[in-house]
Amino acid sequence: MSSNNEILFARAQKSTPGGVNSPVRAFRSVGGTPRFITRAEGPYFWDADDRRYIDYIGSWGPAIVGHAHPDVVKAVQDAATRGLSFGAPTEGEIRMAELICQLVPSIEQVRLVSSGTEAAMSALRLARGATGRDTIIKFEGCYHGHADSLLVKAGSGLLTFGNPTSAGVPEDFAKHTLVLDYNNPQQLEDTFKEIGNQIACVIVEPVAGNMNLLPATPEFLQTMRRVCTQYGAVLIFDEVMSGFRVALGGAQSMYDIKPDLTVLGKVIGGGLPVAAFGGRTDLMQHLAPLGGVYQAGTLSGNPVTVAAGLATLKLIQVPGFYESLATQTGKLVAGLSAAARAANIAFSANSVGGMFGMYFAAEKPQSYTEMMKCDVAHFNTFFHAMLDAGVYLAPSAFEAGFVSAQHDDAIIEASIQAARQAFAQLGQ
């Protein structure tokens, strides 16, 4: 007899490509049937078969205060009674912008949009418009949404201009995108010496979370800041994932580096669709209606989303919030590592704030190339053992995990105990 999840997946595939609205949800890389979620609360969610799971994806980052937090739910309910969307400015948008500028010192002005892809795409357009240059630099393994210019992966040559890695991306778009190695400061410096006056911007995840978890080295980001300043290129930190996730001021506050523009998302919407890009006033003044760089959106600054975001940002400003979050994430990572050692499994793990990564490799990867050498088959087996034990991890070996403020000691210990059993099975 088919489970409710299997029935829903079969039904979904008839009306939705692949049965999902974002590819990783399909379980294609790990195999099996995706879980269709019916409700969530705190650190848990429940699937269509009423099975409860400890959740470590947290909607891919936004659920930092836990699912269905009463303060966030009330803010959404109150806002909804006043209207869902106006197509006109509101005071809530001002409050959100003021708060972001207050919490992220590099941001002097900010504009709200509806998705991380839209924010990254707009930041690139702004950088090109402000500099009058076309070439952008991104790094292999970093994900900045699905805009055409950013779906590019380079070959191995130092100055190899990328071929599109998604069907439907014209080479004329891809040719302006140069892809370099993450955590390779010398390659970056050499590239700027070669074509620095042609480069409009460099965009980077300071804590990469879409090739599993891979933090940038301080030297890498310091070199980036220096050469961008030297050659007049715009430095863009994509903190859609790390912003308000690893620290109150984002990863840039941890590294003490000021980008020219920052892209935000996820946490600032409290679980509803929103993103933002902001930075230096002289750059932001190039945006319409003041300047010639056009950007607009029907639902930008949506009042219900803004209400959820403001409620979430209030909760994460409580003293000790990030210290506690990092402590719990560290306990999880230490417990997973100890369980793997006990089972003699080649495994390593890392954490930054409320993000963590698991690698089926003896040492923590330091580059995209090293990350690709991790044992995916072992991860897939581990994933399903944990899923069967009621622990929901990212259904991909190359996605970061997320801990919320609701993951207390009992939740962490239950997760580690499940991992002990999963590693033991893997070692047989």
Swiss-Prot record:
Q: What class of enzyme is it?
A: isomerase
Q: What is its EC number?
A: 5.4.3.8
Q: Which cofactor does it need?
A: pyridoxal 5'-phosphate
Pfam families given in the database record: Aminotran_3
The record's subcellular locations are: Cytoplasm
Instruction: Locate the N6-(pyridoxal phosphate)lysine modifications and list their residues.
Output: K266
Recorded catalytic reaction(s): these are: (S)-4-amino-5-oxopentanoate = 5-aminolevulinate
Q: List the disulfide bonds.
A: none
Q: Which GO terms describe its molecular function?
A: glutamate-1-semialdehyde 2,1-aminomutase activity; pyridoxal phosphate binding; transaminase activity
Q: Provide one Gene Ontology cellular component.
A: cytoplasm
Question: Which keywords does UniProt give here?
Answer: Cytoplasm, Isomerase, Porphyrin biosynthesis, Pyridoxal phosphate
Return the similarity comment: Belongs to the class-III pyridoxal-phosphate-dependent aminotransferase family. HemL subfamily.
UniProt-listed HAMAP family: HemL_aminotrans_3
Q: Name the chain's protein.
A: Glutamate-1-semialdehyde 2,1-aminomutase
Source species taxonomy:
Bacteria, Pseudomonadati, Pseudomonadota, Betaproteobacteria, Burkholderiales
Report the gene name.
hemL
